[in-house]
Every structure is written in structure tokens, then in C-alpha cells.
């Protein structure tokens, strides 16, 4: 079975396993901690989710599905995973979140677009950062031939859908639309605009090289890979460990300073800046409104703090909660279900969602595909972590399509927004053109 479904097909009618042999045996065993789950991955087609050296990395495909477009793509993905996980015979000696069968996913930003994909890797390494490491395998354990890594070479850069001058025009039109809405009593307050950039290398781009470079340079971010989508996102959309849930909301950005004093001054100015704090408040409110009804407890920090990355500072707010107990015969919301419930946040779409989405489609003149959509993993217990696919690129052979953007409010300046987007391209540009 290919695992690829067409519109109108749930993908649940047949055997979800690519081997086509029905239920598979899954085994998770504790192994010595190597200190790096990204070291020595045998092939370029990998899945990964790593932060501070802890996380998951795997290869091969035991099962795969590409979901049809639609608002129900998260629900369809959950149903397919439940069908797959229920037919596995599991031996789990570790019993932590991320052990047993695990699926990785990358979902489209826009429900009207195709391309949301779930992959269950055939081999998966895990490490919790507290001295425990494990290996999960589907079926018999074999020896995978190691394909040598090849760093990108001969990289050439090309403009994407909107070259810089036209993107500045799009930002100006967004600002005008927001101001007009305010004058006329409308509800549009923020829209997030993005642009793309292409890189072409002399040979197919190896995701393993990019992952290691990103993880080394941005340890505070979540370095990820799934179906050719590779990046290092600073934004945790949702994490679920049993009933405990958490998120990290980011919106509002300024550069790092050249000296400690300059850096502190830039950070203080960001915390006091009306445009950026307004943008951040919309993002926090959207998370509260979507996650709050699903929780019996929800704690949101009273004000943003600074998240300092190597090249940028962001306004950040931590959100923590406890899921509401399910009713009779019900079950807790899974990590994937929660990701679907909170996406898209105002941090990547705008306020209100529907109006902002319409303006994005009008002004960006491109398909974001899976940029700014949920990316992450979920295990058979429904635990998992999903980030927002930012600071990333979609790999396709010798080509990489990079994305970056920012939140536009009434006080936004097109030239400043372009400069911010250029800085947000830097992690992937540096990883590709080391």
C-alpha cells in the first residue's frame, strides 16, 4: 500500500503498514546513551525532533500517509494513526513519552492545500537528556547500509514568489487594510505575511548535514525533519505528556546586539515597544481562546519575557495547563488533536483568523505549503510535541525552498519587516551555505 490517499478517501480502509503484511511487531529497548541521536544516521531521508541533544531521530518507513486537504486533516490523521497503532504488537521496556510506535508529521498551514503527511519510521532512536536512551524497531532488526553524508556545494540563490520590493508593497497593503478596518469598525488587527527564497545546490541536499548544523547552532530551538521539511523552530505549538500540556507563544522580534549593553538595550526596547507587544498580545489571546476550553486548568504568564536566540530576540510567553478529564467512554485529546485545535494561532496567521487568512491568500501570491503549519511527533499514548514549522526549508532533490515572515499590525513599517524577514532566513541560509 502506498499510504497516499486522494480527496474523499479516509485512508483507513486497508492495511496501513507499507509491508502489506498486517500487524507488525514493535520493540523498544533501552540502549547506552550515545549523547547524540543525530550522529551516524544511515540515510538522508530522516525524521527528527531534537532540542538540547534530547529527542528523537529515525529512518525508514513502516507506514506513511499523505492526507487530503480540509479542516478535518488532523482528525483524519488521528484516525489513521489509531488504526495503525492498534494493529501493532508492542514490547516497550522503557515506557516514556516517545517510546513504542511513534509517528512524525508535517501539516499544511492552509486547510485548502494538499501535502499534510504522517510517517511512522522503521527505526527510531530516542534520548531523554537524563541519561536514558532507547531504540525502537519495527519487525526484524537488520543492518542498514550507511550512505555517506555530503554537505551542500555550489549553492545558488534565487528570488521566490515575491522579490523584496513587491513584498514591501504587500506589507504596505496589509497595513492599509488593517487601518481601514479600524476606521470602519472592522475586526482585522493583525496579519502575518511570509515570503520564500530558493537555493539550488550542485547535488541533492542531505538533510542530515542541515540537522546537525542547526542543532549545534540553535540548541534552544526544536530542530526537526519530516518528509523533506527541515528546520529549527523556536516556537512550541503544543506539548502533551499525559494530562499536562504546555506551549510557548512567540511574537515580536528584534535583533541581537553587538555588545552585551547593546543587546540588553534592544531587549528592553522590545519589551516596551507598542507595536511588538500588541502583536504578541494577539498571539497569546488566540492560544488562550483555543486551548482554554480543552483544559480544567490553564496558567498563562502575566507578561512576555525575552527568548534570546543567536541571531534574534523574541517576546515569549509560557502557557501551561492540565487537560480536562474526558466524559464517560471518551479519551484525552491527543497531541495531534491539540495541534489541530490551536492551529493556526495569531502568531502565524493573524487576528481574526478567517479575515487574516483571506488577506494572506490575496497578498502572498504563493502556497506556503507546510511552512507555519504544525510539525512534530506523537506516540501511541497520544503524548507528543508539535512545533510551528518556522526557520525552515522544504528540500526537493537539489532544491531548497526557504520561508520567513512576520506579524503585520497598524504600526508596521515595510522596510523594517523586510529586514526582519531577511534575518529569519539566516538559520537555513547558513546551514545550506556553511
Feature map (PLM): residue ranges:
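Contiguous alpha-helical scaffold segments within structured protein domains
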Residues: 2-33, 39-40, 51-79, 140-176, ...
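Short, solvent-exposed loop/turn elements at beta->coil junctions and helix N-caps
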Residues: 108, 227-229, 375-379
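An anion-binding catalytic pocket shared by soluble metabolic enzymes
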Residues: 58-65, 114-123, 195-282, 293-299, ...
